[in-house]
Structure formats: structure tokens, C-alpha cells
């Protein structure tokens, strides 16, 4: 029992040794695969455009979050403790990128519900022009929503850590997290994932072609991804809020901290696992990735122009 608690304690007090290295590895592995999201053919439908924005924000989130933590652990350079600018901007970008990522996830599931609907009015709501406007509005609102982070986050003179110095925001933060980046997206994606499957069973012949059926599979796999790797973290946040005022012994605190660390690690899989989900669920995605990689490796060739002889 003592050995188990000692191991758990090590994990809880050294989370970066586990989650940062694994997360950075996943980032590097998925970087090549996600390049396919920038191909023109994957930007012409609402769902794939949501996937594009989702992939970009996930990459940026992992780069900003994990790189700074790895530098802090590996080289002892923690800019959040020494630079007030980085303390504020890091929190700012993390909050807006996570909001955009989760919102694009559930918007893609809503779009697939519209696409598979038997009602023409609902199918018309899947419109690329409206999608561009929604994404623009989402980015604008997310940037405005993150502004308080630039004001209230400061380096504590006591602990020398980058912390929130506003009591009201400390109350708002877990509520926001549960609503917009935890339970909210999970419930919406599960609901519309079920409705999409229901539409498919009710409709013998889909209006869309095979590529759209593959998009449906990709979206449903997204539902599984967020349900498996984000929902447990959401439940743990609720548990922490409920038991916040309770008196806990050292062993319980060690176990709770280790569980929180492990579940936080699982959320990194959400940010880095989308490429693998797309590769598993879509043969077209796999084929396009393969073609794109091999095309990059082929040198450009110029065919000589033969002049007609007189």
C-alpha cells in the first residue's frame, strides 16, 4: 500500500514528466497527417471546414501548452514565473483555442444531422457561406471572451506562479469549463450523433454521396473521442467542486491529484487524436494523405516543348 501511494504521489507531483512527453510525441506524429486538412477538396463543405479549423486550433493548443511546459521541466526555464506577458498571453491563447476547438467539434456533428435529415429546410442549413460566417463569429467571440485573462492573471509575489487574482473569475472559470469545454460539447455531440444515426436508419438512400457518408463516420468517431477522453475529466471537475469544502487526509489528496493528472493527460488525446480518428474512419482521408505525401516527395518535372520542324 505504501509503495502504491508513493508511486501515485510521484505521478501527481510530476505530471509534466508523463503528459508533456507523451503529448509532444502525439503532436509530432499527427502533424504530418493533419496537413491533409489544408487540401482544397477538404474545404468545400461545412463539416470539413469545421474539421479544418478544429485541426488548426488543436495544433496551436498543443504547441503553446506543451512546448512551454517541456521547456520548463527539461531546462528549468518557466516563463510563466518570470514573464508577466507570457503569463497572460499563454492563458489567453489556451482559453480561446480550446473554446474554438470544442465548438467546431459539436458544430460538425450538428452539420451532419442537417445533412442526413429528410427535411429539405434542415438540409439547406448546411451551407458553406453560413459556416464561414459562424466560424468568423466564433473566433471573434472567443478572442473577446479571453480578454479578462490578459487582465486578471498575474505572477504571485508569494508563490511566484501565474495565477488568477480575481475571485469572481475563479467562480466563473469551472462553470465555463463544464459548460463550454466539458459537459456541454460532450452532450451536444452525443445527442446529435444519435440523431444522425437515427436519420440514417430512417432514410434508405442518403441525399449525399459516399464521401458524405465517410464524413458522417468521421463525425461519429469524433463523438466517441470526446465522450471517452473528455467526459471523465468533466466528471472529475464536478467531483472537485462538490468536495471542495471537505476535509481530506493526505492519502486521499494524493489519490485525487493523481487521478486529476491522469484525466488531464487523457484530454490531450482529444487534441492530438483527431488525425488518427480520421485515418481510421475514412478510406478517402487515408488515400489523400498517402497521395499528398508521395506527391511532395516527387520532384517537379518540366517537359520540353518540341518545336515543329520546317
Labelled PLM ranges:
Residues 2-4, 60-71, 97-108, 114, ...:
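Fourth transmembrane helix
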Residues 10-21, 67-82, 112, 153-164, ...:
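Peri-membrane helix termini and adjoining interfacial loops of integral membrane proteins
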Residues 24, 28-30, 47-107, 171, ...:
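Extracellular TM2-ECL1-early TM3 structural module of rhodopsin-like
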Residues 35-49, 110-134, 190-219, 241-253, ...:
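Intracellular signaling interfaces of 7-transmembrane GPCRs
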Residues 53-56, 93, 137-140, 180, ...:
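Hydrophobic residues within alpha-helical transmembrane segments
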Residues 58, 89, 111, 136-140, ...:
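Generic structural signal for small/hydrophobic residues in well-ordered secondary structure
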Residues 223-238, 258-307:
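Seventh transmembrane helix
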Amino acid at each position: 500500500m505504501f509503495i502504491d501511494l508513493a508511486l501515485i504521489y510521484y505521478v501527481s507531483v510530476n505530471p509534466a514528466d508523463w503528459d508533456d512527453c507523451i503529448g509532444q510525441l502525439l503532436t509530432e506524429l499527427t502533424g504530418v497527417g493533419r496537413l491533409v486538412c489544408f487540401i482544397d477538396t477538404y474545404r468545400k463543405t461545412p463539416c470539413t471546414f469545421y474539421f479544418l479549423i478544429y485541426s488548426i486550433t488543436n495544433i496551436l493548443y498543443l504547441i503553446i501548452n506543451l512546448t512551454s511546459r517541456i521547456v520548463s521541466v527539461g531546462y528549468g526555464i518557466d516563463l510563466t514565473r518570470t514573464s508577466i506577458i507570457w503569463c497572460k498571453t499563454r492563458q489567453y491563447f489556451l482559453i480561446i483555442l480550446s473554446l474554438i476547438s470544442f465548438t467546431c467539434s459539436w458544430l460538425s456533428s450538428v452539420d451532419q444531422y442537417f445533412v442526413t435529415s429528410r427535411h429539405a429546410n434542415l438540409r439547406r442549413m448546411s451551407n458553406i457561406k453560413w459556416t464561414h460566417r459562424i466560424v468568423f463569429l466564433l473566433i471573434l467571440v472567443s478572442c473577446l471572451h479571453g480578454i479578462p485573462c490578459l487582465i486578471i492573471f498575474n505572477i504571485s509575489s508569494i508563490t511566484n506562479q501565474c495565477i488568477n487574482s480575481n475571485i469572481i473569475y475563479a467562480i466563473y472559470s469551472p462553470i465555463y469549463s463544464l459548460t463550454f469545454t466539458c459537459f456541454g460539447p460532450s452532450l451536444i455531440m452525443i445527442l446529435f450523433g444519435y440523431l444522425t444515426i437515427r436519420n440514417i436508419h430512417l432514410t434508405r438512400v442518403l441525399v449525399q454521396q459516399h464521401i458524405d457518408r465517410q464524413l458522417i463516420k468521421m463525425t461519429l468517431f469524433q463523438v466517441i473521442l470526446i465522450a471517452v477522453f473528455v467526459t471523465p475529466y468533466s466528471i472529475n471537475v464536478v467531483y472537485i467542486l462538490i468536495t471542495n469544502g471537505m476535509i481530506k487526509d493526505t492519502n486521499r489528496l494524493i489519490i485525487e491529484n493523481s487521478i486529476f493528472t491522469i484525466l488531464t493527460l487523457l484530454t490531450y488525446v482529444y487534441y492530438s487524436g483527431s488525425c488518427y480518428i480520421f485515418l481510421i474512419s475514412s478510406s478517402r482521408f487515408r488515400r489523400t494523405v498517402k497521395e499528398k505525401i508521395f506527391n511532395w516527395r516527387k520532384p517537379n518535372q518540366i517537359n520540353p516543348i518540341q518545336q515543329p520542324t520546317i
